[in-house]
């Protein structure tokens, strides 16, 4: 099972360059995490910069991590807009969270549907909502079977490595209860890297940045 900051049943989205290595992640909908709105901020926190040849102290394998800055979500239901904003910023596009939320139809009581978030992401990044055929773009899929040897997990890890190596972050929907005891609901974060096992044959850990203002660290931001 992939460890570190990843749920046992994760939703993810990957940018793919062709149909043979098409998408990844979520048939379910993005939901809010029931977060308090009292300390919302638009602060950008620099993320840790790590050379992709570093050895991880736990797995002993190669670590690859994109140098992306955390954008903290402004409102309790803005996890998807903030995540998409980070992905766009990593590609040199600056789009305000409020604008993205409006385009995605982010709801005051629910949050954002993943399908809407990915359409808006593709629109800004590639110029179309839904990629077809061999077109590059983010697509949705689900890791329905979390077992490490399942086809779902193998496909996820293969595409994770491909996308991070190509410089494209991942769009994750995580189960809050798996990552943060006492919390509930689904939550969007941006996947920024991975660590391989010592022999390089498998993914041991994944890294993500969490836009929630409830989990920001003074040094590492949402990492």
Language-model segments: residues:
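Active-site-adjacent structural segments surrounding the nucleophilic cysteine of cysteine proteases
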Residues: 1-19, 23-135, 199
């Amino acid at each position: 099972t992939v460890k570190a900051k990843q749920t046992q049943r994760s939703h993810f989205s990957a940018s793919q360059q062709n149909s043979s290595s098409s998408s990844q992640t979520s048939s379910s909908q993005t939901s809010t995490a029931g977060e308090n709105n009292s300390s919302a901020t638009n602060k950008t926190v620099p993320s840790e910069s790590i050379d992709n040849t570093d050895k991880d102290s736990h797995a002993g394998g190669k670590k690859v991590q994109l140098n992306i800055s955390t954008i903290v979500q402004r409102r309790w239901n803005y996890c998807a807009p903030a995540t998409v904003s980070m992905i766009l910023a990593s590609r040199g596009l600056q789009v305000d969270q409020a604008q993205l939320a409006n385009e995605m139809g982010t709801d005051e009581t629910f949050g954002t549907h993943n399908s809407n978030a990915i359409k808006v992401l593709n629109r800004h990044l590639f110029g179309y909502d839904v990629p077809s055929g061999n077109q590059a773009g983010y697509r949705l899929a689900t890791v329905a079977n979390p077992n490490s040897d399942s086809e779902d997990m193998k496909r996820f890890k293969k595409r994770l490595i491909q996308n991070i190596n190509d410089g494209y972050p991942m769009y994750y929907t995580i189960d809050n209860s798996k990552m943060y005891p006492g919390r509930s609901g689904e939550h969007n974060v941006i996947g920024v890297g991975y660590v391989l096992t010592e022999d390089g044959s498998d993914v041991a850990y994944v890294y993500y940045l969490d836009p929630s203002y409830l989990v920001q660290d003074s040094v590492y931001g949402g990492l």
